[in-house]
From Swiss-Prot:
Membrane-protein topology: Peripheral membrane protein
Organism field: Oenococcus oeni (strain ATCC BAA-331 / PSU-1)
Protein's name according to its UniProt entry: Spermidine/putrescine import ATP-binding protein PotA
Subunit text: The complex is composed of two ATP-binding proteins (PotA), two transmembrane proteins (PotB and PotC) and a solute-binding protein (PotD).
SUPFAM superfamilies, per the entry: MOP-like, P-loop containing nucleoside triphosphate hydrolases
Catalytic activity: ATP + H2O + polyamine-[polyamine-binding protein]Side 1 = ADP + phosphate + polyamineSide 2 + [polyamine-binding protein]Side 1
Length: 367
């Protein structure tokens, strides 16, 4: 017997969406596998919520193909897709109590009263609201309303749960709690979650896989660690966490020049003397006495952030460096910046994700 090829649960092939002359999505390709937590991460207006609307069927593409379980669904109505959406405003029915909100979907589908009751009780227990079934929506908190919205979506037994910035209206502490609860819920259920956010901390904390969206296209996709440690371009490096990005020249494999000096690094596969951008994260820099530093700097500014100090320093070539430090520094003081070769990440100018992956594979294969 021939072994079947495992197909993606959801696939975008060259998908575009235009509103007149405005190109909202530009030939997007992506694949979603079953049973993982995905995040569409990007700034406002980048196209991430549009991708969610295309998956759900609320919008239809003007070009390309959307496949769910291998079948083209470009014109398939929302109610015939095995997906459900939790919106930013939760979209709960204020005239119904918690129980009736969760029961709404199964009731519309014609489930028996017994099955509906079993489903509702099971879903409310899953989101830790089993004692809230008789409560009115106006009587529960924002975090509890968020859980009711999730329970209502899950009661329809979807293969995919779409979450459109559902945590953005919550306060910081509750948002952190809900991040953990959503991740735990996805792992327990084993279904696919696709989460939309502009908050990179949320994306890094919750996801198995991140699609970084900008200007209607996928800039980069990968695991949280890969995207943070190996950003493909200036936008990704700057958007995912804080980054020091300075111009440099790749002298040869594993040797880069920036700020007037040469430094060993762990990148390769570029042309000799190719112009590049150099990335070093603030947490990878240590402030030391000038003689121990690889770069000499002048402390320009600092601010206390509770668990650390954010220090701004200027090197002798005029580059500005952000440093995350446990101890304060004196403004105007001459200090050194210490870092290791593996802390330096090199980005080519205008490199595509395909070329980036190929280059990475080629020089990693030489090790």
């Amino acid at each position: 017997m021939t072994e079947e090829t495992v197909q993606p649960l959801i696939e975008f092939k060259n998908v575009s969406l235009d509103y007149g002359e405005t190109k909202v999505l530009k030939k997007v390709d992506l694949e979603i596998e079953e049973g993982k937590f995905y995040t569409l991460l990007g700034p406002s207006g980048s196209g991430k919520s549009t991708i969610l609307s295309l998956i759900s069927g609320r919008l239809q593409p003007t070009g390309g193909d959307i496949l769910i379980e291998g079948k083209n669904v470009n014109s398939l109505p929302s109610n015939q897709r095995k997906v459900n959406t939790v919106f930013q405003n939760y979209a709960l029915f204020p005239n119904m109590n918690v129980y009736d909100n969760v029961a709404f979907g199964p009731s519309i589908k014609g489930f028996s009263k017994k099955k509906i009751d079993q489903l509702v009780k099971s879903m409310l227990k899953l989101v830790k609201l089993d004692d809230f079934s008789d409560r009115e929506i106006s009587e529960i908190s924002g975090g509890q309303q968020q859980r009711v919205a999730i329970a209502r979506a899950l009661a329809n037994q979807p293969k995919v749960l779409l979450l459109d910035e559902p945590l953005s209206a919550l306060d910081y502490k509750l948002r952190k709690e809900m991040q953990s609860e959503l991740r735990e819920l996805q792992q327990r259920l084993g279904i696919t979650f696709i989460f939309v956010t502009h908050d990179q901390e949320e994306a890094l904390a919750m996801s198995d896989w991140i699609f970084v969206i900008n200007d209607g296209k996928v800039e980069q996709s990968g695991s949280p660690v890969d995207i943070y440690d190996e950003p493909i371009n200036h936008f990704v490096a700057n958007f995912i966490g804080e980054a020091n990005i300075v111009p440099g020249v790749m002298k040869e494999d594993y040797l880069v020049s920036f700020a007037g000096k040469d430094f060993k690094n762990v990148d390769a596969g570029m042309r000799t003397n190719e112009r590049v951008e150099v990335v070093i994260r603030p947490e990878d820099l240590d402030i030391v006495v000038p003689s121990r530093g690889k770069l000499q700097v002048t402390i320009e500014d600092q601010s206390f952030r509770g668990d650390s100090y954010e220090i701004t320093a200027i090197d002798d070539a005029g580059n500005e460096w952000a440093v995350q430090a446990t101890n304060p520094a004196k403004i105007g003081q001459r200090r050194g910046l210490k870092f290791d070769p593996e802390d330096i990440h090199i980005m080519r100018l205008n490199e595509s994700e395909e070329d980036f992956d190929a280059r990475l594979e080629s020089y990693e294969g030489e090790d």
